[in-house]
Amino acid sequence: MKKTVLVLITFALVIAVAGSGFWLVHYFIDSREQRQTYETLAEEFVLESTPSVRPESSSSLDSSVDAGENDVSSPVESPDTPPRHDLAALAAENPDCVGWLTIPDTGIDYPVMHTPDDPEHYLRRDFYGNSASGGTPFLDGRNLAEAENQNLILYGHNMMDGSMFKPLMNYLEPNFRDTHKDIFLEIDGRQYRYALLDVLETNTQCSLYQYTDLNDPVTESNFRAAILKETDLEGVHQAPGYLTLSTCNNGGGSSRVLVIAALAGEVSQ
């Protein structure tokens, strides 16, 4: 009897291991195909023009955000300004594409999707709508696809192969935060630079998820108060807009990591 039970347990373990191996192989093949898809998109839809004037230092831009003096209508530049993408051509390829997100030297370089009537449509779909475990970064359905007066919440998966929003985990390390403060978002036909405010480990009940439309001054003030409550920041000055990047923490479940940034201004052409 004991021998029979042992054989059954061994058989079950073999099946489980084989199944896990098959899943892992499928996962990484799928991930590789997705990576190739987004690399191709980045190459095909990149624009040739780049800022020609010597960029202003990142520290001076950060100080303008901290002082609440930066005007989004006044273009700014950054030392590592990434190339722009042809958003009109991307939208012609897929009307759900409203922007492009880039964080230099992190691997985050993806189109941004927006489907207000079905907010999580791209949770497990690639740019072309095909089934994909990594999905495509997407904008919260409550947001407007514009930079000003919005807390733009972008969602992306924490993938085992290091793709999508996995690099956001690195922001939990102080040294990484200090050297990756610039976040670039192309949206509404323009390219914007956001300056990093803070990163936090939280969950899906975090109060920052409640804020998307900041057009009302009271709501905007309440949002900044919520940032102070959720982080260790001592103060957050008013900015024209904000960006919140959200991904699952390594612990899974309802745990999340949020990277919060303030709009520094439009990048000049």
Predicted stretch roles:
Residues 1-14:
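N-terminal Sec-pathway targeting helices
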Residues 16-269:
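Solvent-exposed, non-transmembrane regions of membrane-associated and secreted proteins
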